[in-house]
C-alpha cells in the first residue's frame, strides 16, 4: 500500500489479537477490511519476533501496541476461531504449574483454579492445618460469588478486605500468596472482585501454548488470522503508523496513517476498531470528544501498567535437573518465589517443549520474565541495576536447579519490554471500559483494557469477536 486513499467497510487500528480476530471474521462475511500496523509484523505486543538464527522471542515487537503473555486460556478464542473459519494449533499443557521457592530450593507441582489451589493449600500457600477450613470457605465463596457480589467487591483490595473477613493470620497470608502465585508482585493491592472473577472466568481446556507449523511461540496465535484476512481479500498494511481516527459530526469516517516519510494513506470507513489500550486511543481521537468520566477512568487504569524484564537463553539441548538426574521435560509455567517472605520473582518456561518452531531444530528456548507494576508512577521506579540483580539472582537459582545449564546455553540475553506489557490491570480495583463510547458512532474499542469476563490473552479474542459482531450489525 502506498500513499493515497482506500475505501473500506472497516478500518482496524493495530494488528493485536483482537484486530486480527475481527478482521478474519469480517472478511469471511465479505467485508472490505484494512488493518493498519505500524511495525513490520502482525501481532502487536502479543506475538513473537524471529531472530536471524531462528529463535522466536515472545512479547511482541518493540514498537507494537496492546499486551501479551506466553501461555493462554482459550474459551472465547475457540468461539472466534469457529466463527472466522480459522484453525489455531495449540499444545495443551498437562502439568501447568510448578512452584520454586529459592534460595532453599523447594519445588512443588500444582494446577490453576480453586480445586487445584485448595488441594495444594498446605504446601503451595503454607496454610496452617487449623486454618484450612476457613481457607476452603473463602475460596469457595469466591468461586461461587454472583455478578452483584463481584461488582461490589471490585473496588476493594485484599489488603483492606482480609483483616475484616478472615480471622486466621495464616489464612490471610495464604490468600496473599495465592494472588502472588497467580500473578501479582503486590498482592495486597489486588482487587477482591477480580480474584473472584479469576476463579470463575471460562478458560477452556487449557492452558495452552501455540504450536503453529510455520512460526514459533505466541506468533503462532497471530499468523493464522492474518493468513485468513489476506486470503479473503483483506489488506494488512505493515509499516503504516495510525495517526488519527477521523471523527466528525459525532461519528467515525475512517483513519489516517503515515509511512516512515510521513506520507499519508487515508482509509475511509464508517467503522473503526481500535486495538490499543484505552488511554492510547487519545493519541488518535482527542480526549475532549469523550465523556469526562470515561477519560478519568482511562487515565486511572493507565496507572496500573507494568513493564517486563527478563532473560532469554537459546539452548543446545535440554538441561538436566540436578536433584533427579533427569532431562527437563516440564512444559508448564515455573513460578519463582524468593525468601521467607515468598516475594514474587516472576517465572520461566521452556517454550520449545510445546512450540516446535520457537527454536531451530534440535535446540530449545528458555525464557525467564518478571513483571514490574508502575503503581501510579511514570515508571516502575526500579533502576536497571536493581532489576538486573533480581534477574541474576533467579538465573543463579536456575544454575543450582539444573546441573548443566551453562553447558547447554548457546546464547543468552536480558530482555526489557517497555510498558504496557502483560495484562497487569486485570487485577486493578476499578471498572474498565465498554466496547462503545456514547457520542462517537462507529468507534469500537477492542483492546485488552476492555471489561470482559475473560482470561488474559483470551480477552483479546473476546474483544475481537465482540467488535466483529457489532461491526456487522452497524454495517
Q: Could you tell me what each predicted segment is?
A:
Residues 241-361:
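Mid-domain catalytic core of redox enzymes
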Amino acid at each position: 500500500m502506498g500513499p493515497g486513499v482506500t475505501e473500506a467497510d472497516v478500518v482496524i487500528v493495530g494488528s493485536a489479537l483482537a484486530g486480527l480476530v475481527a478482521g478474519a471474521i469480517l472478511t469471511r462475511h465479505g467485508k472490505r477490511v484494512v488493518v493498519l500496523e505500524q511495525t513490520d509484523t502482525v501481532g502487536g505486543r502479543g506475538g513473537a519476533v524471529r531472530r536471524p538464527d531462528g529463535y522466536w522471542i515472545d512479547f511482541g515487537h518493540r514498537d507494537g501496541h496492546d499486551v501479551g503473555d506466553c501461555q493462554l486460556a482459550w474459551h472465547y478464542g475457540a468461539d472466534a476461531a469457529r466463527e472466522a473459519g480459522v484453525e489455531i494449533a495449540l499444545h495443551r499443557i498437562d502439568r501447568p504449574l510448578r512452584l520454586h521457592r529459592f534460595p532453599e530450593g523447594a519445588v512443588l507441582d500444582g494446577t490453576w483454579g480453586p480445586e487445584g489451589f485448595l488441594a495444594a493449600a498446605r504446601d503451595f500457600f503454607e496454610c496452617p492445618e487449623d486454618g484450612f477450613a476457613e481457607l476452603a470457605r473463602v475460596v469457595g465463596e469466591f468461586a461461587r460469588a454472583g455478578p452483584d457480589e463481584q461488582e461490589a467487591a471490585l473496588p476493594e483490595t485484599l489488603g483492606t478486605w482480609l483483616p475484616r473477613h478472615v480471622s486466621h493470620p495464616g489464612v490471610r497470608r495464604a490468600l496473599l500468596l495465592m494472588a502472588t502465585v497467580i500473578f501479582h508482585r503486590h498482592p495486597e493491592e489486588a482487587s477482591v472482585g477480580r480474584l473472584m472473577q479469576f476463579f470463575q472466568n471460562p478458560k477452556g481446556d487449557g492452558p495452552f501454548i501455540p504450536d503453529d507449523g510455520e512460526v514459533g511461540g505466541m506468533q503462532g496465535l497471530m499468523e493464522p488470522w492474518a493468513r485468513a484476512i489476506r486470503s479473503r481479500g483483506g489488506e494488512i498494511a505493515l509499516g503504516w503508523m495510525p495517526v488519527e481516527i477521523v471523527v466528525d459530526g459525532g461519528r467515525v469516517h475512517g483513519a489516517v496513517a503515515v509511512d516512515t516519510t510521513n506520507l499519508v494513506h487515508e482509509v475511509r470507513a464508517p467503522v473503526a476498531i481500535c486495538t490499543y489500550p484505552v488511554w492510547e486511543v487519545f493519541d488518535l481521537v482527542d480526549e475532549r470528544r469523550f465523556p469526562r468520566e470515561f477519560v478519568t477512568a482511562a487515565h486511572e487504569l493507565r496507572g496500573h501498567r507494568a513493564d517486563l524484564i527478563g532473560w532469554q537463553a537459546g539452548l543446545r539441548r535440554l538441561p538436566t535437573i540436578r536433584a533427579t538426574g533427569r532431562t527437563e521435560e516440564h512444559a508448564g509455567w515455573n513460578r519463582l518465589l524468593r525468601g521467607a517472605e515468598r516475594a514474587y520473582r516472576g517465572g520461566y518456561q521452556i517454550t520449545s517443549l510445546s512450540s516446535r518452531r520457537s527454536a531451530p531444530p534440535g535446540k530449545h528456548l528458555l525464557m525467564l520474565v518478571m513483571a514490574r507494576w508502575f503503581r501510579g508512577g511514570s515508571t516502575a521506579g526500579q533502576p536497571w541495576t536493581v532489576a538486573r540483580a533480581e534477574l541474576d539472582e533467579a538465573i543463579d537459582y536456575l544454575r543450582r536447579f539444573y546441573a548443566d545449564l551453562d553447558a547447554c546455553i548457546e546464547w543468552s540475553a536480558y530482555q526489557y519490554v517497555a510498558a504496557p506489557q502483560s495484562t497487569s490491570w486485570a487485577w486493578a480495583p476499578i471498572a474498565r471500559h465498554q466496547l462503545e463510547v456514547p457520542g462517537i458512532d462507529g468507534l469500537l474499542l477492542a483492546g485488552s483494557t476492555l471489561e470482559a469476563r475473560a482470561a488474559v490473552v483470551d480477552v483479546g479474542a473476546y474483544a475481537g469477536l465482540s467488535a466483529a459482531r457489532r461491526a456487522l450489525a452497524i454495517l
